[in-house]
Amino acid sequence: MSESAFCIHPNVSIADEAIIGPFVVIGEPQRGAAPGELATVIGPGAIIRSHTVIYAGNVIGARFQTGHGALIRELNRIGDDVSIGSHSVIEHHVIIADRVRIHSNVFIPEFSILEEGAWVGPGVVFTNALYPLSPDAKETLAGPHLLPGAKIGANATLLPGVTIGRDALVGAGAVVVHDVPDGAVVVGNPARVVKQVREISAYQADALLGDLAP
């Protein structure tokens, strides 16, 4: 792809073997910052598809992939082998560990944490403001925290500050208002525990279950 077809701002480091699609922007300065003020680092083997915008100050590991039109705000830490689907939005100060998969049309706000191997289905919404527009809303922001191997079904909503336990499974369309225990399956609005992941035959041989396996 011709360099004229995308925009790479100053102070951006992209390792070898990257594939960058048309109309991609990398190193976009945050509001009030000058171009190149924050360093942006992307590891080897990245595939960044068309119309994706990556703000400055991100540190991204190896073999990173996006769909089309993903938006990644500033000052995030993203591990190796992470994929972010088309039209998903990652706000600033988010931590995404190795092997996390985020599908299309997902919204992840600032101060969220996704640990190793977490999986987020399409249309999922994380929230981080318990009382939006309240006087101390900005000071009390707290995003959801996904422990390793947590799986979030399509169109689920996670309320601020909830922790989704290791290898837990959140059903499609669930509204999670409380922490989810390790290995639990939750469904509904509000989400409630209905079984354990170890009871689902499809997961019995899943190496991600670790010591939760029977």
Question: Which sequence ranges carry the predicted segments?
Answer:
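Structural signal for interior beta-strand "rungs" in well-ordered beta-sheet cores
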Residues: 2-14, 18-187, 192-193
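Short cysteine/histidine-rich zinc-coordinating motifs and their immediately flanking basic loops
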Residues: 31, 199-200
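A short hydrophobic/aromatic micro-motif that marks alpha-helical segments and, especially, helix-coil
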Residues: 50, 203-205
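Residue-level marker of structural boundaries
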Residues: 191, 202-203
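Leloir-type glycosyltransferase catalytic cores
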Residues: 212-214
